[in-house]
Amino acid sequence: MLNKANKVFLMSCLAVLLLSDGSFAQKEEKQPNVTPVFEVQDLFESVRIPNIVVTTDGTVLAFAKSGRLLRRSEDGSKSWGPIQEVGSDSGGSAIVDDNNGDVMIVNSKGGYLWRSHDQGKTWKREEIVIKPNAVGHGTPDGIPVQTTCSESGVTLRYGKYKGRLLMPARIQPPKGNNDQEWWPYNHNTAIYSDDGGRTWQTSGPVQSGTGEGTLAELSNGNIYYNSRCHMAVDHRRRIAWSYDGGHMWTDWEVSEHLYEVGQPFYFKYGTKPSYGCNAGLVRLPLEATGGKDVLLFSTPDNPGSKRVRMTVWASFDGAKTWPVKRLVYEGLSAYSSLAAGQDGKVYLLFERGKKKLYESVAVARFNLEWLVKGQN
């Protein structure tokens, strides 16, 4: 809980973000975005694995069932079109190519993707090439790399690798085996493409025991990787950084501020670490923050215990600290995904339930003003 002085300081920071340059202030006079906004509605029933993105024209695409089901909103989540199927085998995570507006559901384990040229209205299946990393991880017919259950990917915007497509991914040897004895060998990685998604390179690893990752690029070109850990005795998230466009991951660390959550899992080895939970991560567009790096993170807020209390955290210093958080949903909640529009509106797609955990996938729409004013 922040004291009154710190709350005043954070509100001052928000004012700076909203009015830090003339062009943004002028834009806000025409289309105010300082009134707190918060709305929640259910989009899917009895399915799991949410993923959400905002396309280059502002269309919001909410995916469920690992990218197989889709609902579209062309008015900023106020209304939604009917459920449509991307493809019966379209399992994977989403990415928007900011270079040309294409949207893709990448199934790197299967060696293909589904692509849309029209903001998610229609889709076409394409074969892709997955190249392994230096130790041979990432081949569909060997030890595959998969994006399923990871956060959506990003188009890099800064520096030498501007325009590269980068997606969080994971390695599950052998051949995707999720048996308990193999968990120490599981680890997150990434895949990246410099040719619009036709060819993907598997990157180096992050910490062992990780899975279901999230990543975000800062305005200096550094890439922040935040991972679920299936063996977190300390109940904390795992962090890594890339300074070469996502090719290698260094500066591994344990988060001081973000806890791993999820019911303790019984291990035959005698320990009971948290089993962890998938999470969401997004960096707000610089156009909406006056050029400041503002990151948001989402996961249930119940360290080391059952999945409840879907919460969003905010960082204003490039993921060094996370001083603000706000509860979105009190009840049962689990996997989540975050996206943001150019106007600063944030979209949180998450699993929730009243009596059972996975009753629905809901979308919450809010802005930074709502998050900061009501921080808890």
Residue ranges with predicted function:
Residues 26-376:
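Asp-box/BNR beta-propeller blade signature and adjacent active/binding-site loops
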Residues 10-20:
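Bacterial N-terminal signal peptides
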Residues 5, 18-19, 191:
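Disordered, low-complexity tails and leader-like regions
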